[in-house]
C-alpha cells in the first residue's frame, strides 16, 4: 500500500455498479414527548 491514492482507480470507478440502499436510522432521536415522559418517570 502506498500513501498516495491511485487516481486511475478513482477516475474509472463506475457509480452505476453501486446498489441503491434505503437508509434506516438505527438510533432515532427521541421525541420531546418521550423525553418528558422519561423525566416524569424518574
UniProtKB/Swiss-Prot annotation:
One of its GO terms (molecular function) is actin monomer binding. It comes from the Eukaryota. This is Thymosin beta-11. It comes from Oncorhynchus mykiss (Rainbow trout). Residues 1-25, 33-42 have a biased composition (Basic and acidic residues). Coiled coil: none annotated. The keyword Transmembrane helix does not apply. The modification N-acetylserine is found at residue 2. Keywords: Acetylation, Actin-binding, Cytoplasm, Cytoskeleton.
